[in-house]
């Protein structure tokens, strides 16, 4: 299984790398983490998939961990000059 699944012309390589690193450091089984990059109008959507039972750990209490991850990934995406949305999927 690949760590990140993107097309060859990634629009947000820095954001994908940062997001993958952060999520892998949170979950118990980092091999199950994938990040898919999807063009979604003017923004790029990053779909983060984690293993079974890991989504709660990534989202955190009241969504604080997910909000923090989104903030850091958006800052990394600004280096790439793109706007991103992040979806956490089970």
Spans of model-derived segments:
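Glycine-centered tight-turn and secondary-structure capping sites
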Residues: 60-63
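RNA-contacting regions in translation and RNA-metabolism proteins
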Residues: 1-55, 68-90
């Amino acid at each position: 299984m690949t760590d990140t699944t993107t097309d060859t012309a990634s629009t947000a390589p820095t954001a994908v790398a940062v997001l993958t690193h952060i999520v892998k450091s949170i979950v118990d089984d980092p091999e199950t983490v994938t990040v898919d990059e999807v063009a979604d109008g003017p923004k790029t959507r990053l779909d983060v998939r984690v293993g079974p039972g890991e989504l709660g750990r990534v989202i955190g209490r009241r969504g604080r961990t997910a909000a923090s991850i989104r903030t850091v990934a958006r800052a990394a995406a600004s280096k790439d000059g793109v706007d991103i949305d992040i979806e956490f999927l089970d």
